Amino acid sequence: MPPLPLRLSALVLALGLSACDDAPRFTKAEPGEARSGGKTTVRKTDQNAFSLPSANLPPSRRVDFSVGNSFFRNPWVIAPSTTTARDGLGPLFNTNACQNCHIKDGRGHPPEPDASNAVSMLVRLSIPDAPAYAQVIERLGVVPEPVYGGQFQDMAIPGVVPEGKVRVDYTPVLVRFKDGTEVELRKPSLNITQLGYGPMHPDTRFSARVAPPMIGL
């Protein structure tokens, strides 16, 4: 194919660029954006907004919501107890109530360096897979750490030794943008200390997980 004349090439380029500029301009809200949940959208915007039932939940179902919400909010206790509906805590655990991790039914957060525990963040444990673990991997997806299992539990009921302590340290990292603006970020470093049941597998893998939002619970 012979090369296009210079003027024709410029015209094709201009048309191509104008076509690229046909993308929609989101300068104002689209229909429905103000009620992203449709008929379930609630009007509250305060710290309790995630803890409310759907706006279209009929009154006859509000009792069911309240009962479920109480189980999510109230602490579990050691068995035996008169609170039989919520007993059975421990012997090892990460926290004694769902909402301790899913704060106000929202997202959790990593612990601060001086925190006494890692509530709202947990640590998953695994070791490298091998043919001998084929059935375990098929069932669980990973191979749990042999002593501490698949999830590190840093709390325990009285008389039981917790599995250890979870601590996160932070190193300041300075980041500079192209316009010269500088911001200081924090690089986290996970530390597992005071192991209560002996050393871990030397090739243990750690995965810190912050509790996700559980809106409406």
Predicted regions and their residues:
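Extracytoplasmic redox metalloprotein regions
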Residues: R25-S66, S70-L217
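Hydrophobic alpha-helical targeting segments used for export or membrane insertion
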Residues: L11-L13
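Bacterial signal peptide processing site
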Residues: D21-A23
